[in-house]
Amino acid sequence: MRQIILILFLLFFTKTTFSEDQYLVSYTLVKSHTKKSISELWKKHKIPKVILPVKNDVDIYEVIYKAKWIDSTWITCSGIYYVPKIKKAAPYMMFGHGTQIQKQRDVSDGDAQQGICLGFATDGYIACYPDYYGIGKGEGRHLYQHSWSEAMSFVYMLYAVDELNKKINIKNNGQLFLTGYSQGGHASFAAQKYFEAINDSRFKVTATSPMSGAYDMTGEQEKYMFQKYPKPFYLPYLLTSYQIAYNVLPDTKNIYTIFKSPFDTLLPYFFEKNLSRSFEDLDKLMPPIPKDIVKDYLVDMYQNDTTFLFKKKLAENNLTNWKPKAPVQFCYCKGDREVNYKNSEVAYNTMKSIGVTKIKLNNLSDHLDHNTCAAFAVMATKFYFDRFKKHGDNPKMKDVPKFKKALANIIKKKEEKKYKESHHDHARF
């Protein structure tokens, strides 16, 4: 009997689409939130409704869609789609999540990043949470800090949900907002670059707010390769990802042979078909200086060989020297020791120097670190997007209503005080 009920449930709630859909493979309604249940979540997590208003019930779908892999073959990817129950047309908001090395991704009310999408959705945004290639229920291997595949996870998911909207009677108002935190900052900014290059009239970027991302890969972020760093996992993640994407070491058949023992045999457990091991698990096993796990000849090549393909490809994935058309706000905190805050400053200053005018630099705190900065970056992003949502592409108004800004500052001061008293910045030195 239970098996029959399960089959009926899957048939009712999971819809496999047919040939008229070019990108959408399937969609499943996984959860429905009422305003009451969202209010209870906000109360549990001490989220002020004046900062994130609760205005609409929200349906949450898991979406499977088609995307092109690096060799131009088609693979499937996944994502979460947050749909407010409203009749009027609404803007898209796409959120790029932070770094993960494990494939598994659940739909969970306890996930803070998914909560951001729920918060936008209940306030009238149609929110997308694309899994990067190889994460969630998607095929392929995740390519860390790889601009093209990050961006394409955004692009193809948007194509897919545009097809889905016709089935669930949802309309977009023509606005598209892009944001994300940490790797998601890099991913959302890469998505803007590619959306604007594709120039599809259906999906014009309205504004972007990348948060605490590593945009200057061969500049500010590169320095961490050679010094004590709280997240040393990033270097082998980059090397193994870029070997797949670009074959940066063409004479190396097994990329793991470039790592010193025991990492040559340890790393595959984290980067190959890893369902649940986190980068925090890996960091506990690594030396504090990232380059110390790589064989010396490779470090020497990076430092002295100007033709070294790995460094060239890192430079290609910098996001500092191009001209975005839609307005951009960089959010960051100067206390960030995981993603050097100067990434944002370098991107801003470089773009200003080449004539970009619709660009803003927003330092949220001189003290908060990478983790504690996130909530305030999200607040600033929400305030920034709300201007455009309410007033159109060129809003002539102050960024934030005074009372909201005052409340956000009160919350920030409390967090900074708690952070200072803890004498802990999540770094492992």
Which residues make up each language-model segment?
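Alpha/beta-hydrolase active-site loop
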Residues: 144-166
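Short alpha-helix in the alpha/beta-hydrolase fold that links the catalytic acid
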Residues: 191, 326-327, 340-351
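Catalytic-loop region of hydrolases
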Residues: 19-88
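Short, surface-exposed "cap/lid" segments of acyl-processing enzymes
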Residues: 70-78, 84-119, 137
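C-terminal catalytic histidine-bearing segment of alpha/beta-hydrolase fold enzymes
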Residues: 222, 306-313, 338, 345-346, ...
